[in-house]
């Protein structure tokens, strides 16, 4: 796979992710919902300070550590992608790594810059604006990640009483609210796990080289 194809894949994901985030941030009130397909596929504007899928991580210091970790991971990802492209890894594996990288970069952009360029979004506040006169709602590396995709396929249903521990309680499936970057990371990881044998299968010339090497070793042992 050529580098320019890799760059196009990454750019496409980041543009889609950031475009939707900016639209939601500036066009929807915090907590507002828009039904896209029935009641099970919605836009639901929230922000989170933590990891993917709304998981939180240790307050302000945790937020800073998480953002720095993301930055290091993205820098490492640049070199790793160059390496697997130059070594001609399986096309599917390269695409999955690009998806994971683009997702990490998409959320990193939020964490690094959104606090600087947007006004605060919260319950009862007006729509957020870009580059507000008084400055953004947070400093560098302390921005909140914008989430908006919610797919409650089963919402607020009561579990049968015979189910241990949770019987009789109400639940929603699928409850996390996420964004395109989160989805890109998750799909990339899942596809790698499902198709790892295909992605890392030895090529015919590598298998032939292994057979020849083993044969040479056996001949040497017999001579000795």
Role assignments for model-derived ranges:
Residues 1-224:
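Alpha-helical transmembrane bundles and membrane-interface segments of multipass inner-membrane proteins
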